[in-house]
Amino acid sequence: MELRVGNKYRLGRKIGSGSFGDIYLGTTINTGEEVAIKLECIRTKHPQLHIESKFYKTMQGGIGIPRIIWCGSEGDYNVMVMELLGPSLEDLFNFCSRRFSLKTVLLLADQMISRIDYIHSRDFIHRDIKPDNFLMGLGKKGNLVYIIDFGLAKKFRDARSLKHIPYRENKNLTGTARYASINTHLGIEQSRRDDLESLGYVLMYFNLGALPWQGLKAANKRQKYERISEKKLSTSIVVLCKGFPSEFVNYLNFCRQMHFDQRPDYCHLRKLFRNLFHRLGFTYDYVFDWNLLKFGGPRNPQAIQQAQDGADGQAGHDAVAAAAAVAAAAAASSHQQQQHKVNAALGGGGGSAAQQQLQGGQTLAMLGGNGGGNGSQLIGGNGLNMDDSMAATNSSRPPYDTPERRPSIRMRQGGGGGGGGVGVGGMPSGGGGGGVGNAK
């Protein structure tokens, strides 16, 4: 029996779960366009979907904000239909054997800071910054980072008067304990600084593969929160970031030193990482680790031709030229030369073995099976399928905030499971939603 929503959308299989409600793959009946459909039972004690849809509508028009297509109710459910997105950063992290190269971390950091900046500019804080809540786009927006799941978002100031919410203490932990700021653990009301501190932990999670306060044993959730808090408080920023460029220490120090109602200097934080990116000699070619894992090594003629076929006008020719330049540079430079630059930024340290392995365009291969994490079938069978080209841009600066054609990943039908966003296919987004006081 065919299930329909609003007589406009055909309801398909479940592809994930958000902090509140389940997410399904849907199809627009008239056009065949695939969408994400979030459902929430109308009998739930604390309905959130209507509130979340208002947040999304407030954010509409921002780069990396999912487009809301339709909101309403159908039978026993509140419904929100939104733009379909690709895999979450948590899914991609698992796909890349739970370690990102420094280049990929810096490419992501720039976009993620921009997304948080935009949300704050609209007078809201997210309060659940984690890899599951950042998704990659699809098609032409395949390398654009999106931020999702506003189920825990909160207005931190009045839009007209700009009056900030008051400082409070004895607040319950809201968000995910693994990435929560120190002040959140201490029961202090969250503000803009806390979103950015959480992002700092996400970036170090990508660098390290795991944070020092993961995997702690406890009898119950409350004790686990306490153990995470104790470990986080006792781990200095210098120790946490040991073996990685000092910019990560500077970033976290900056976040922790901010006052409760202080406006963060987002430009300064982006510049920290952009300067490091340039110093290491990386190129803004939008080639992330997951691109290399699938396609391997330098550009080949077929990939360059795909870029040419998929791009428009002069931008297309520029992309092709840049892709060719990346191929030539990758062929000419050795892994040792690239690693030398990374080592210099690390002050002589070599970083982790897995990190070194991914520098200089060296590739890894995963041939089928389950990549682990959140029950996502990552590759093999009906798993990950990248069917668009990776068109590089010939630029020394990151033009992330223009929604131009980027390298892309299109997800085809695959194993479901997991939760957290509006991803689809073999890489559904996320790992069990946001939740209040998630102990992950």
UniProtKB/Swiss-Prot annotation:
<dbReference type="GO" id="GO:0035332">
    <property type="term" value="P:positive regulation of hippo signaling"/>
</dbReference>
<feature type="modified residue" description="Phosphoserine">
    <location>
        <position position="334"/>
    </location>
</feature>
<feature type="binding site">
    <location>
        <begin position="15"/>
        <end position="23"/>
    </location>
    <ligand>
        <name>ATP</name>
    </ligand>
</feature>
<dbReference type="GO" id="GO:0030177">
    <property type="term" value="P:positive regulation of Wnt signaling pathway"/>
</dbReference>
<keyword id="KW-0539">Nucleus</keyword>
<protein>
    <recommendedName>
        <fullName>Discs overgrown protein kinase</fullName>
        <ecNumber>2.7.11.1</ecNumber>
    </recommendedName>
</protein>
<dbReference type="GO" id="GO:0044297">
    <property type="term" value="C:cell body"/>
</dbReference>
<keyword id="KW-0067">ATP-binding</keyword>
<comment type="similarity">
    <text>Belongs to the protein kinase superfamily. CK1 Ser/Thr protein kinase family. Casein kinase I subfamily.</text>
</comment>
<dbReference type="InterPro" id="IPR008271">
    <property type="entry name" value="Ser/Thr_kinase_AS"/>
</dbReference>
<dbReference type="InterPro" id="IPR050235">
    <property type="entry name" value="CK1_Ser-Thr_kinase"/>
</dbReference>
<keyword id="KW-0808">Transferase</keyword>
<dbReference type="GO" id="GO:0007165">
    <property type="term" value="P:signal transduction"/>
</dbReference>
<dbReference type="GO" id="GO:0030838">
    <property type="term" value="P:positive regulation of actin filament polymerization"/>
</dbReference>
<dbReference type="GO" id="GO:0045880">
    <property type="term" value="P:positive regulation of smoothened signaling pathway"/>
</dbReference>
<dbReference type="InterPro" id="IPR000719">
    <property type="entry name" value="Prot_kinase_dom"/>
</dbReference>
<feature type="compositionally biased region" description="Gly residues">
    <location>
        <begin position="413"/>
        <end position="440"/>
    </location>
</feature>
<dbReference type="GO" id="GO:0051781">
    <property type="term" value="P:positive regulation of cell division"/>
</dbReference>
<dbReference type="GO" id="GO:0043066">
    <property type="term" value="P:negative regulation of apoptotic process"/>
</dbReference>
<dbReference type="GO" id="GO:0042752">
    <property type="term" value="P:regulation of circadian rhythm"/>
</dbReference>
<dbReference type="GO" id="GO:0005524">
    <property type="term" value="F:ATP binding"/>
</dbReference>
<feature type="active site" description="Proton acceptor">
    <location>
        <position position="128"/>
    </location>
</feature>
<comment type="subunit">
    <text>Forms a complex with per. Interacts with Dlish. Interacts (via nuclear localization signal) with Bdbt.</text>
</comment>
<keyword id="KW-0597">Phosphoprotein</keyword>
<dbReference type="GO" id="GO:0005634">
    <property type="term" value="C:nucleus"/>
</dbReference>
<dbReference type="GO" id="GO:0030307">
    <property type="term" value="P:positive regulation of cell growth"/>
</dbReference>
<feature type="binding site">
    <location>
        <position position="38"/>
    </location>
    <ligand>
        <name>ATP</name>
    </ligand>
</feature>
<keyword id="KW-0418">Kinase</keyword>
<dbReference type="GO" id="GO:0045879">
    <property type="term" value="P:negative regulation of smoothened signaling pathway"/>
</dbReference>
<dbReference type="Pfam" id="PF00069">
    <property type="entry name" value="Pkinase"/>
</dbReference>
<dbReference type="GO" id="GO:0090263">
    <property type="term" value="P:positive regulation of canonical Wnt signaling pathway"/>
</dbReference>
<dbReference type="GO" id="GO:0048148">
    <property type="term" value="P:behavioral response to cocaine"/>
</dbReference>
<dbReference type="InterPro" id="IPR011009">
    <property type="entry name" value="Kinase-like_dom_sf"/>
</dbReference>
<dbReference type="GO" id="GO:0005829">
    <property type="term" value="C:cytosol"/>
</dbReference>
<dbReference type="GO" id="GO:0001933">
    <property type="term" value="P:negative regulation of protein phosphorylation"/>
</dbReference>
<dbReference type="GO" id="GO:0007446">
    <property type="term" value="P:imaginal disc growth"/>
</dbReference>
<dbReference type="InterPro" id="IPR017441">
    <property type="entry name" value="Protein_kinase_ATP_BS"/>
</dbReference>
<keyword id="KW-0090">Biological rhythms</keyword>
<dbReference type="GO" id="GO:0071482">
    <property type="term" value="P:cellular response to light stimulus"/>
</dbReference>
<dbReference type="GO" id="GO:0090175">
    <property type="term" value="P:regulation of establishment of planar polarity"/>
</dbReference>
<feature type="domain" description="Protein kinase">
    <location>
        <begin position="9"/>
        <end position="277"/>
    </location>
</feature>
<dbReference type="GO" id="GO:0005737">
    <property type="term" value="C:cytoplasm"/>
</dbReference>
